[in-house]
């Protein structure tokens, strides 16, 4: 279960002319680290440091970060669902989803390839391919999650190596910020392609952090777009790993979700801190509550007088019958009238009927 929180920082996106072309009202990140594998995969102790480093840089960029360590297959599926259901409903949010762990590419019988991310309880496919397929999360499921998000911008990063055939791979040329930047988009970046492996010391993570520290601003406009990040990671990771890793970048194959660009803002002037709230310490409803209480008491008093008047009327009717009763003596009749006058001697403030009855009874 995710708590609904926001850092209270809004991110403004402006074009080269200073015109605002977009706004992120909330920024949320899901960072998943899988290191303690139990079913035949090599453990990845360096993932713990990777997660901490990624969390830190994302928080510096205004993200509220949810961290999940060593999820099994059920937990992995649930945390993606919960995160998206909790934070992915608002159009003005930006969502970043980062997975660090093993990846795998399975050659399908029809000739294509399917990429997977591997939870800690998934068997090694070399030993148990059926068990692996049942436990691992394939890219088709990631695509389902991506389309379930209603927030305009979502960026999926995988510090894993697998086939990215489900999204449109590209070597895009970063474009300047424009109104198109704010259009909906789902972007994906992986640390490597099929048949490659990610070392425990992650060059991908190191370069991701370096990019967000400013090195990824390819066109030096004060922003890093998802496209710029993809280009930067492709260049630097290939270089620093001596071509043992080839990061993949692309957008989802959906014309409704491939026009915009995820944005990181480098300048602090683009972060808008909401105004301080006004003083609410003295706020109360005491005057309203006092008036309500007075009205309630008056209503109770009026109800009692109404009941009192009904009893007075009934007593008068009874005494009137006694007065006409030939079996009663004059003294008993007089006692009946006197008893009414003595008992109902108060003046009813809500009626004049009591005064009329009292005058007849005397």
Model-derived regions: residue spans:
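Cysteine endopeptidase catalytic domains of the caspase/legumain-like
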Residues: 2-324, 335-349, 353-361
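Alpha-helical protein-protein interaction scaffolds
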Residues: 330-331
């Amino acid at each position: 279960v995710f708590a609904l929180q926001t850092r209270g920082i809004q991110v403004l996106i402006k074009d080269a002319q200073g015109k605002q072309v977009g706004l992120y009202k909330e920024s949320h990140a899901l960072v998943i680290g899988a290191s303690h594998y139990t079913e035949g995969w090599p453990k990845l102790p360096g993932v713990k440091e990777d997660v901490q480093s990624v969390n830190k840089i994302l928080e510096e960029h205004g993200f509220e970060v949810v961290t999940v360590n060593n999820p099994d297959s059920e937990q992995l599926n649930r945390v993606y669902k919960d995160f998206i259901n909790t934070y992915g409903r608002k159009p003005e949010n930006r969502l970043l989803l980062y997975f660090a762990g093993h990846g795998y590419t399975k050659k399908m019988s029809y000739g294509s390839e399917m990429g997977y991310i591997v939870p800690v309880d998934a068997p090694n496919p070399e030993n148990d391919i059926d068990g692996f397929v049942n436990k691992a999360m394939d890219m088709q499921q990631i695509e389902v999650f991506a389309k379930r998000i209603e927030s305009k911008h979502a960026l999926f990063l995988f510090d894993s190596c697998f086939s990215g055939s489900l999204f449109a791979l590209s070597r895009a040329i970063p474009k300047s910020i424009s109104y198109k930047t704010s259009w909906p988009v789902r972007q994906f970046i992986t640390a490597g392609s099929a048949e490659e492996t990610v070392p425990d010391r992650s060059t991908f993570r190191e370069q991701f952090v370096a990019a967000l520290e400013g090195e990824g601003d390819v066109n030096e406009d004060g922003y890093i777009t998802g496209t710029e990040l993809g280009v930067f990671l492709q260049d630097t990771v290939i270089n620093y790993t001596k071509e043992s890793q080839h990061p993949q970048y692309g957008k989802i194959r959906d014309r409704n979700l491939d026009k915009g660009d995820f944005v990181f803002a480098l300048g602090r002037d683009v972060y808008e801190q909401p105004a301080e709230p006004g003083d609410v310490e003295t706020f109360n409803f005491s005057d309203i509550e006092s008036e309500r209480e007075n009205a309630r008491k008056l209503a109770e008093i009026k109800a009692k007088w109404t009941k009192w008047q009904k009893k007075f009327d009934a007593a008068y009717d009874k005494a009137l019958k006694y007065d006409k009763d030939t079996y009663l003596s004059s003294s008993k009749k007089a006692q009946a009238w006197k008893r009414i006058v003595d008992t109902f001697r108060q003046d009813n403030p809500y009626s004049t009927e009591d005064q009329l009855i009292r005058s007849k009874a005397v």
